[in-house]
Structure formats: C-alpha cells, structure tokens
Regions:
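Soluble extramembrane regions of membrane proteins in the secretory/endomembrane system
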Residues: 29-200
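Membrane-interface helix-loop-helix junctions at transmembrane boundaries of multi-pass membrane enzymes
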Residues: 340-341, 462-476
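Aromatic-rich transmembrane-lumenal/periplasmic boundary elements in polytopic membrane proteins
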Residues: 276-295, 301-303, 391-426
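Membrane-interface helix caps and helix-loop-helix hairpins in membrane proteins
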Residues: 244-250, 355-364, 488-495
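Alpha-helical transmembrane segments of polytopic membrane proteins
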Residues: 203-215, 248-265, 308-327, 364-374, ...
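Juxtamembrane membrane-water interface segments that cap and precede transmembrane helices
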Residues: 189-201, 298-322, 423-447
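Membrane-interfacial entry segments at the cytosolic side of transmembrane helices
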Residues: 272-281, 339-342, 382-394, 471
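Core alpha-helical transmembrane segments of integral membrane proteins
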Residues: 193-308, 318-337
C-alpha cells in the first residue's frame, strides 16, 4: 500500500510540475539571437518585379524575407496596398478596407534596380494589378539600413524569413516593438527558397493529411486494435517531426503521415500498456507541442497539420486543435481516475494554458471548445448536478479570460486582440463575423462539408453503441459536444469534421484499465445524490 501511495504522489507531483513548466514557457522572454534596430524612418518602395540577381544583391546588403500579401484565401493589388499603408489586416472573407488611416506613402517603381543601390529603404513586391487572386504566393521583401542583415523576423508570423504585410508600416515608422527585426544567416536566399517550397508543399496537403489520418484511425478502430488509442499522439508526433525536419517533398510527407503514424501507433501501444503510461504519453505530447511553440515555432507551424500561413501563421490551428482534443480529454479522464478531482483540475488547467496563452496556442476558439468539453466531461465523471456543470463552465471561462487578458497586456501581435481588446463591442463584432468567416464558406463548400458531417455522425453513433464502458461514453459525449461547439465558433468546418472523424475513431477504443479513485470530499450542492438500494422486509 505504501508503494502505491508513493507512486500516486509522484504522479500528482509530475502533473503539477507539468502545469508549472507550461506556465514558465508561456512567460514573456527575449530571443537573444534576434536583433532589434534603433528607431528610424525608412523609405518604402513597391516594385513590380524583383529578379533573382537583384534579390541576391540586396541580400548581401541587408535582410530579406518572403511576404504574404494579405489575410484569407484571396488577395488583390488593391487590398494588399490598403493593408500595406495602414499596417492593418482585414480577412478577404469579410472584405472592405482595413481599419485606420494610411500611415505611410510608398513609392512605386518599375523594375528591381532600386534594390541594388537604395539606402534606408524597404523594397517589396505586391500582387499584380487586376482582379482577385488566390492568396497562395509569397512575395519578396528586403530592408537595407541600420544594420539589417540576414533573415527578417516578424512578430506577426514568429517564423524567421516569413513576413506579413502588416509588419511593413510599423517598421518603416521605426516602431521596434511591432516592427521587423532580423537574425543572422549565412545563406539567406537559399533558406528562403527552401522555406517557400516547404510552405507550398505542406499547404497542398492540408486536406489530404487529415483524410489519411482519419482513414487510418477508423481502420484501427474497426479492427479493434489498441493502437487506435495511441494513434492520435502518434500522428501529432510524426507531424511535429516532419516540421522539425523541414520536409518539402510531398511523397515523403504523405508517407510520414500514413506509414509513419501507423508504425509509431503500434510501437506506442506496445510501450504504453498501463493507464499511467498513457497519461504520460498524452501529457507528454501536449507538453512537447508547447515547448516547440516557444523555442522553434516554425517547426509546429509549417507541417501537414499546421496553420495555412495565409491567415494564421503560428500557434494552434483548427487541425491541431481538433486532434489535441483526444489526448487532452482522454488525459483528463485518466488523471481523474488516478488522482481524483485534483488530477482532473490540474490536467484541465494544463490544456487550457497550452491552448490559450499568446506565446503558445493563442487559439481563442480552441479555448472555448476545450473549456466546454472539459466542463461536460467533469459533469459526467463526477456525476454532478446542473449547478456543478455551470460551476465547471464558469471556472473554465474565468481561466481562459485571465490568460487572454495576460496576453493582451503584452506588446506585439495577439490572435485574440481583435475579439477581446474592444470590450463588449469588439466581442460582439467577432461573433457577427462568424457568418462571413465560418458559416458562409461552409455553405459554399457543402459538397465537401455535408458528406464529412454525415460520416462523423455515423462514426459517433457507431462508437457510442459499440461501447458499454461508462468512461468511454463520458469521453465520447464530451468530445461530441466539443466538436459541435467547434463548428459554431471556428472558421474551417471541413478541417474540424475530418479531424473529428479521426479523434472519435480513436476515442472509441479508449478503455481505462484501472478503477477510479474514490472521492473523499463530497459537495452536496454540486453532486447528484447516489441511489440508495432498498431492502425488502424479511418474510
């Protein structure tokens, strides 16, 4: 008995250390390799083209990067120019002018010769004049003066070499807190060529990668293999490995997501045979993503499940958010069964910090989804009354709001600033934007969204009917509610549905082996009364 208690206390301590470590990762820090220039005004020059020779020449004199000219699936010369001069964005699904007045007045020059001799200048390309274009091309940008040399580093993208168009105006005005900095590079042009190929290849495979993962996890679940319970962590680990290896070959990417995930899932299933091992696997994968988002955000961002690099550049996108629901919710179930209420609360807090904090996931929609799912899960696991569910939901909301306000208090870009910095009006405007950003695109893509929705419902019903394990049903219910909320608050329905198929298939084979600990503290106000067995009178 003493050995069991000591082991339990060590695992509780490990959960506490995990939460503390993630909180430390989320604390503001300074990247010593990045160099911030002194404030100074720059001349901004828009060229109609920039040849390879001119780009190589300016790279020897300054710092260079690749620039995304807009936000959303489409762009144009007019919208890119409007965002350039204002240093503000507007999603192409919404349209119209970005907020604010023009801050800079760029010069327009034909040819790229100006880049070879200018001083104190920012030279960049924009999309060609004409109609609307797909926002799938990166354009060259260079800065000369004030010691700039190497790769441009953007506070908006968090990816060395990748620049957003909203970074140009604050840089030109000499605002170091929101402008571009740089990091040294021996072959900046070669690095940018590789970066562009990597972004292009991974963006082409966003749907394919999720469909492959969903099919693989469904197959493992249908075959009744325990590897289904470790397949989502395996897919997330392979995805992160492909990002760290900076793979740009599409054949290798597909092979990694399919064959690599299957092999790793079977290997993890052999190693993680106990609930404690699964708990450490689920928590370890999430912690690894958190550490990567702080130390090497480009590894987590540029991979098959990463953001699309045309509206969200870093943090947790809808694909990874949906896949993370499996280890976060299943881990919360195991933490509750192993350590009771304390374990559930610590693991839930750990997940909310990773999902919400601005230096980590910075995913407001994901925070809402996870908070609601955790409240439903706790309500079911602890057999609470409705008041208990409301209490858990309120606790999750307070935690998320505290993390959001903590991020808003720091300088620099924040994915959640537009929704929360404007008070009630800003939040209402964010809710109103769900129609053009979420629901209208889903209606336009109904031929893809409708079949995925039908498959997800069928998989969920089959999983629910095939299991009689109460913990699995509790997990399925929380996951189903979370996916429903995700469709309401997020803006990529097809990604969420495909990812949902994958995680429901995995959760269907999740069966805890250890008996849950008994709760020593009872709160009658929140807990449902246990049924009392009646005794029949002796005959």
């Amino acid at each position: 008995m003493g050995e069991v208690l000591a082991r339990s206390s060590r695992l509780v301590l490990l959960l506490g250390v995990l939460v503390a470590a993630v909180s430390a990762l989320a604390a503001p820090g300074v990247a010593s390799a990045r160099v911030t220039p002194l404030p100074a005004p720059y001349r901004v020059v828009v060229v109609d083209r920039m040849s390879d020779a001119a780009f190589a020449a300016v790279a020897r004199r300054g710092a260079v990067g690749l620039m995304r000219p807009g936000f959303g699936p489409t762009t144009s010369y007019g919208s890119a120019l409007a965002e350039l001069v204002r240093g503000a964005e507007v999603n192409s699904h919404i349209g119209g002018m970005p907020p604010g007045k023009p801050l800079i007045g760029p010069d327009k020059v034909r040819g790229s010769w100006v880049a070879t001799w200018c001083r104190m200048c920012i030279v960049l390309q924009l999309p060609p004049r004409g109609g609307t274009l797909l926002n799938d091309k990166l354009y060259r940008v260079a800065i000369v003066g004030r010691g700039y040399h190497g790769l441009l580093v953007s506070p908006t993208t968090h990816i060395p070499g990748l620049v957003s168009i909203v970074d140009i105006a604050p840089t030109a005005l000499g605002r170091p807190s929101t402008g571009l900095s740089w990091v040294g590079a021996s072959n900046a042009v070669g690095h940018l060529d590789s970066l562009g190929q990597q972004i292009h290849a991974n963006n082409r495979l966003k749907y394919a990668a999720l469909f492959i993962a969903a099919a693989l996890l469904l197959l493992l679940a249908l075959l009744g293999l325990r590897a289904a319970a470790t397949a989502v962590p395996a897919a997330l680990l392979v995805n992160l490995g492909l990002g760290a290896a900076q793979v740009s070959n599409e054949i290798v990417l597909v092979a990694g997501i399919s064959i690599g995930t299957a092999l790793l899932a079977f290997a993890l299933a052999r190693v993680c045979r106990s609930d404690d091992a699964l708990l450490m696997l689920y928590g370890g994968v999430v912690f690894l993503y958190a550490a990567t988002m702080v130390s090497r955000p480009e590894w987590q961002a540029i991979n098959p499940f990463g953001p699309t690099q045309n509206s969200r550049f870093w943090g947790i996108g809808n694909q990874v958010e949906t896949l993370l629901l499996a280890p976060l919710l299943a881990g919360a179930v195991l933490a509750r069964r192993r350590f009771g209420l304390l374990g559930f609360l610590l693991f839930g807090l750990f997940g909310l910090v990773v999902m919400t904090d601005n230096r980590l996931g910075s995913d407001g929609g994901g925070a809402i989804v996870l908070g609601v799912a955790l409240a439903v899960l706790g309500w079911r696991l602890f057999r609470l009354r409705l008041s208990g569910f409301i209490g858990l939901l309120g606790a999750a909301a307070v935690t998320v709001l505290w993390l959001v306000q903590r991020g808003l208090a720091q300088q620099g870009p924040d994915h959640l600033r537009s929704a929360f910095s404007g008070g009630v009006s800003g939040f209402l405007a964010s809710l109103a934007s769900r129609w053009p950003l979420s629901y209208l695109p889903a209606l336009h893509a109904w031929m893809l969204v409708a079949p995925l929705l039908l498959v997800l419902v069928a998989v969920f019903v089959a999983a629910w009917r095939r299991t009689e394990v109460q913990a699995t049903r509790d997990l399925l219910l929380a996951l189903g509610v979370g996916l429903g909320v995700s469709l309401l608050v997020n803006d990529s329905a097809a990604y969420e549905l495909a990812g949902g198929i994958a995680v429901v298939g995995a959760v269907a084979r999740f069966v805890p082996t250890a008996a849950p600990v008994r709760l020593r503290v009872r709160v009658p106000l929140f807990r449902r009364a246990e049924p009392v067995a009646s005794e029949s009178p002796p005959s």
